[in-house]
């Protein structure tokens, strides 16, 4: 399969620092300082509010890697905590369909620790790029992508973690069609209570219970997102491209129907119940009627994912066992997490300096010292 992220190598300025143990590159006007373990070719492969991502060659493993720089990582407590959460989560996890952190590059001195450099496995592209490209997608491609998403999600959920932000850009793919789930900055454990206070999860893939501000939600929110993503793969366009909350709910009810009273047991808020009851009554449209030409078994699985009542939504284990995935499903090759993940740093009083210290310790724990590096 072709990939769509072949970014050309840039000519970048590089300067050895700290006696050659570190190298500072200037990438699109941004300083990018890494240990000498990481060598060119350097390619910028992503940029966002957090900072910049570049690919480099890891002289220890002999493989290309993705290095994400989070600039001024401790200026904002919420952002810093998000970084700490992703580091701890991904270092806890060990699964073929979850992207791995291979290193956290510690700075030369603790005093200089303002930017965080996280090293990940390098993938070629993501599902968003593939969906938007002219790349032909066969039924087998879509089926294999779905299987891998669910296989990774089974592991994540078994670790007592909800991803909460599954969307095509967070599903990384390589040329062999291997898929890995990424971006755990919004993830939560089931025991955490401040579920929706910090960030807004991408609207198009958001389950009804999130749109209705239900705080007691479950792993079913991720299953809803998978249903939306899989239909987008099959149909090459977003299933529910809502402009705002109201439009999002309208698009959902126009397709799957207005829920009955018996399907609203998960709503604790009288206002949310009243809102749903005042929506225009809609009957569900069978997916086989709306999406003619798409595999009926695939649509049957999607219909079981896109159920308004989260308690009636299919679980990840049941989805893996659905007839549509029979050719790929092997319960003996779909591992669960050995132990649940616990994130113990949610106290409102935790300071930026405390978070910095915790990330520093993570860097010490997983990176080689400069004297141990390949020069």
Curated annotation (Swiss-Prot):
Signal peptide: none
GO BP terms, alphabetized: innate immune response; intracellular signal transduction; pattern recognition receptor signaling pathway; regulation of gene expression
Swiss-Prot/TrEMBL catalytic activity: L-seryl-[protein] + ATP = O-phospho-L-seryl-[protein] + ADP + H(+); L-threonyl-[protein] + ATP = O-phospho-L-threonyl-[protein] + ADP + H(+)
Gene3D superfamilies: Phosphorylase Kinase, domain 1, Transferase(Phosphotransferase) domain 1
Compartments, record wording: Cytoplasm; Nucleus
Phosphothreonine PTM sites in chain numbering: 197
Motif stretch (TXY): 197-199
InterPro entries, per the entry: Kinase-like_dom_sf, MAP_kinase, MAP_kinase_CS, Prot_kinase_dom, Protein_kinase_ATP_BS, Ser/Thr_kinase_AS
Modified how: Dually phosphorylated on Thr-197 and Tyr-199, which activates the enzyme. Phosphorylated in response to pathogen-associated molecular pattern (PAMP) chitin and in response to necrotrophic fungus B.cinerea spores. Not phosphorylated in response to osmotic stress.
UniProt note on regulation of activity: Activated by threonine and tyrosine phosphorylation. Activated in response to bacterial and fungal pathogen-associated molecular patterns (PAMPs) including chitin, chitosan and peptidyl glycans (PGNs). Activation in response to chitin requires the CERK1, MEKK1a/b, MKK1a/b/c and MPK4a/b signaling pathway. Activated in response to necrotrophic fungus B.cinerea spores. Not activated in response to osmotic stress.
Keywords: ATP-binding, Cytoplasm, Immunity, Innate immunity, Kinase, Magnesium, Nucleotide-binding, Nucleus, Phosphoprotein, Plant defense, Serine/threonine-protein kinase, Transferase
Cofactor(s), names only, from the UniProt record: Mg(2+)
Residue ranges constituting the Protein kinase domain according to the UniProt record: 39-325
Molecular function GO terms recorded: ATP binding; MAP kinase activity; protein serine kinase activity; protein serine/threonine kinase activity
Positions of post-translational Phosphotyrosine modification: 199
Tissue note: Expressed strongly in the apical cells of caulonemal air filaments and rhizoids in fully developed plants and less strongly, but readily detectable in filamentous protonemal tissue at the edge of the plant consisting of both chloronema and caulonema. When filamentous growth of protonema is promoted, the expression is strongest in newly formed apical tip cells of protonemal tissue.
Main location: cytoplasm
Inducing or repressing factors: Up-regulated in response to chitosan within 15 minutes, peaks 8-fold at 2 h, and returns to basal levels by 8 h.
Residues annotated for ATP binding in this entry: 45-53, 68
Assigned EC number: 2.7.11.24
Gene ablation phenotype (knockout): Significantly reduced chitin-induced cell wall-associated depositions. Reduced accumulation of PAL4, CHS, ERF2, alpha-DOX and LOX7 transcripts in response to chitin or chitosan. Susceptible to necrotrophic fungus B.cinerea, characterized by the symptoms of browning protonema and stems becoming visible 2 days after the infection leading to host cell death.
Family to which the UniProt record says this protein belongs: Belongs to the protein kinase superfamily. CMGC Ser/Thr protein kinase family. MAP kinase subfamily.
Described purpose of this protein according to its UniProt entry: The CERK1, MEKK1a/b, MKK1a/b/c and MPK4a/b proteins are involved in pathogen defense. The pathway induces rapid growth inhibition, cell wall depositions and accumulation of defense-related transcripts. This protein is required for innate immunity triggered by pathogen-associated molecular patterns (PAMPs). Involved in resistance to necrotrophic fungi B.cinerea and A.brassicicola. Involved in the transduction of signals from chitosan perception to the activation of defense genes.
Comment on protein domains: The TXY motif contains the threonine and tyrosine residues whose phosphorylation activates the MAP kinases.
Protein's recorded name: Mitogen-activated protein kinase 4a
Lineage start: Eukaryota, Viridiplantae, Streptophyta, Embryophyta, Bryophyta
Record gene name: MPK4a
């Amino acid at each position: 399969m072709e990939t769509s992220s072949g970014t050309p190598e840039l000519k970048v300025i590089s300067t050895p620092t700290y006696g050659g143990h570190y190298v500072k590159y200037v990438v699109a006007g941004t300083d990018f300082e890494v240990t000498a373990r990481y060598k060119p070719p350097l390619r910028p492969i992503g940029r966002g509010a957090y900072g910049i991502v570049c690919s480099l060659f890891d002289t220890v493993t002999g493989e290309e890697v993705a290095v994400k720089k989070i600039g001024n990582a401790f200026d904002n407590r919420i952002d810093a905590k998000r970084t700490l959460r992703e580091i701890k989560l991904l270092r806890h996890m060990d699964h073929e369909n979850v992207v791995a952190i291979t290193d956290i590059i510690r700075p030369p001195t603790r005093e200089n620790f303002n930017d965080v450099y996280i090293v990940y496995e390098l993938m070629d592209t993501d599902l968003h790029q593939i969906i938007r490209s002219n790349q032909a997608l066969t039924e087998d491609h879509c089926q294999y992508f779905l299987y891998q998403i669910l296989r990774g999600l089974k592991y994540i959920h078994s670790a007592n973690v909800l991803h909460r932000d599954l969307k095509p850009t967070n599903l990384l793919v390589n040329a062999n069609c291997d898929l890995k789930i990424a971006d755990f900055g919004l993830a939560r454990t089931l025991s955490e209570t401040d579920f929706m206070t910090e960030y807004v999860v991408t609207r198009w893939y958001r389950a009804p219970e999130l749109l209705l501000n239900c705080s007691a939600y479950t792993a079913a929110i991720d299953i809803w997102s998978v249903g939306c993503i899989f239909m987008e793969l099959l149909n090459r366009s977003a299933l529910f491209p809502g402009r705002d909350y109201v439009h999002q709910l309208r698009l959902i009810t126009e397709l799957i129907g207005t829920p009955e009273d018996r399907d609203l047991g998960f709503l604790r808020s009288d206002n949310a119940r009243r809102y749903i009851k005042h929506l225009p009554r809609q009957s569900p449209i069978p997916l086989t009627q709306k999406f003619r030409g798409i595999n009926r078994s695939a649509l049957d699985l999607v219909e079981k994912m896109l159920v308004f009542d989260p308690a009636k939504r299919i679980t990840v284990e049941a989805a893996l066992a659905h007839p549509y995935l029979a050719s790929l499903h092997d319960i003996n090759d779909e591992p669960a997490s050995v132990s649940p993940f616990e994130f113990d740093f949610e106290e409102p009083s935790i300071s930026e300096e405390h978070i910095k210290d915790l990330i520093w310790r993570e860097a010490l724990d997983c990176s080689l010292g400069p004297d141990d590096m390949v020069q």
